Amino acid sequence: MKKGFMLFTLLAAFSGFVQADDAAIQQTLAKMGIKSSDIQPAPVAGMKTVLTNSGVLYITDDGKHIIQGPMYDVSGTAPVNVTNNMLLKQLNALEKEMIVYKAPQEKHVITVFTDITCGYCHKLHEQMADYNALGITVRYLAFPRQGLDSDAEKEMKAIWCAKDKNKAFDDVMAGKSVAPASCDVDIADHYALGVQLGVSGTPAVVLSNGTLVPGYQPPKDMKEFLDEHQKMTSGK
């Protein structure tokens, strides 16, 4: 009984310390005007990871020091963006909302944050058959560069709510219109995750390990890059 009571007391005390640390962080976030945030453990001692709609922050447990931007693990053969690696859970949670163009013989999977008003996004989509033929599966999420509540966001909402999302996306990228539609898909979730991953323009490509590759790359160049990246990260 005594051992059980002591263990309970220790756990309660530890929980109190954690809450106190989070309270200091929450106080700092409130001072900065950040209302919506998710506090998680950080990969280094004495800090917490804070996910916000404006990006990812690392804050010391006492709430006195802040670092903004990605954190890298350089202990291996190649640097690893541990911030984006951590965000893979959130990325995969949106998998059911992605517009997917699957390669018949899949070798690589990339997630592309796209905008229907982006010229290079159109160019990438026009070459979809070439990406797929090279074994590259493309998964789309929406990232309206003009922000939420823009005309582009409303049109992309209609695409993502269409009965046949792939056809609706193809039509819009070909210059056709799409009928207005509404559903449970929230483009704001796509946009917020893009910001957290470091997306600032489109197209932006996220690899399977969370690595962000900004900008357009032709199919063959993308395939070569993905092959090389796979070798580096696998240590082969």
Regions found by a protein language model. Give the residues of each.
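N-terminal "domain-start" segment that seeds a small globular fold
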Residues: G76-I99
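A structural preference for short, hydrophobic beta-strand core positions in alpha/beta folds
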Residues: D38-P41, Y140
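Extracytoplasmic
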Residues: I34, A45-M47, S54, K96, ...
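Short, non-transmembrane alpha-helical segments in secretory-pathway proteins
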Residues: Q19-K35
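N-terminal signal peptide c-region/cleavage motif recognized by signal peptidases
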Residues: A13-F17
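Structural alpha/beta surface segment adjacent to cysteine/selenocysteine redox centers
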Residues: E97, Y101, H108-I116, Y120-S182, ...
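Sec-dependent signal peptide recognition
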Residues: K2-T9
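Thiol/selenol-based redox catalytic cores and closely related redox-interacting motifs
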Residues: S37-D38, M47-L51, G55-Y58, D62-V74, ...
